[in-house]
Amino acid sequence: MKEIVSRKIMNQDLERYLQNFIESKDTFKFADLALHHYLAFNGQDKKAIELLAAGIELLILSFDIYDDLEDKDNRNAVWMKIDSSIALNAVTALYTLSIQVMCQASHEPEFSQKILNFALQSIQGQHDDIVNAPQTEETCLEMIKNKSGALTALPCVMGVMLATGKYHPIVASYSYELGIMSQIDNDYKGLFYLNNDFVQKKNTLAYLYLKKQFNDTSVELLSLYQKPEEFVSINTKTLKEKLTEAGVIQYLLVMKHLSLQKIKKEMSQLKLEDDKTEKLLSVMIK
């Protein structure tokens, strides 16, 4: 990715910022999804998949940066420590570059259109998240599908499309569910930090569940998340016990399990050798 930025970005100051952004990235799970789907469907062009994988990681990084700038959190990130105008321009360059690189992997018009469709779907999901649009479990799941599901579907679907030249609806279906699972995991981890969606009263699955106030612990937790001085005094074990008493943890686990079962059911319909299906599942579910 750093080599691509060096080659494509002529403005040295802008390049320096982008290189710093990339250096902060320590995982490449979306590139792995693209690569393993490409290989599972017998892709052979090493250069093409390398371009797609690099472009995908640049795209994911740009969306992560946009998310931080919009939510004004993750203060320790390098892009949050510089002038917001510089950060915004730099991330726009990163996003544009990512699209350009991915589209170079294949010259088929439909390939580029699918990439843009996934990106636009995620942006629309992000808008619903920013304005706190979801008011029910169903609308929240739809928002998650658009925001997170589309970004997870992109590497899986495009990896297969690069290998076969065709859009694969089954791959799209289970990869959206994978995105929902990942977001549920993120929401769960966020329950244990003060600067989380609860403080902003974001209508996440967990917050919507608590708002139903099924028991006294739910009411207590809703109040607790609005009192920073009390929240920081509670240890993780006690907080986890309260979340369990309120039923939040069980609820999120059930939702995650439902997505996992859908993934396994869809993957069983793939016309792949068993070892390839198992390999894909092991890459997706860790």
Protein language model regions, located:
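A short structural micro-motif
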Residues: 121, 181, 227-231, 262, ...
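Residue-level signal for secondary-structure boundary elements
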Residues: 123, 127-130, 183, 233, ...
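Intrinsically disordered, low-complexity segments enriched in Gly and acidic/Ser/Thr residues
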Residues: 219-221, 231-234
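Mg2+-dependent prenyl diphosphate-binding active-site environment of isoprenoid biosynthetic enzymes
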Residues: 7-219
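Catalytic cores of Mg2+-dependent Asp-rich isoprenoid enzymes
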Residues: 14, 18-39, 204-209, 237-241, ...
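Gly/Pro-rich interdomain helix-loop hinge
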Residues: 216-226, 241-242, 251
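N-terminal amphipathic/basic leader segments beginning at the initiator methionine
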Residues: 1-4
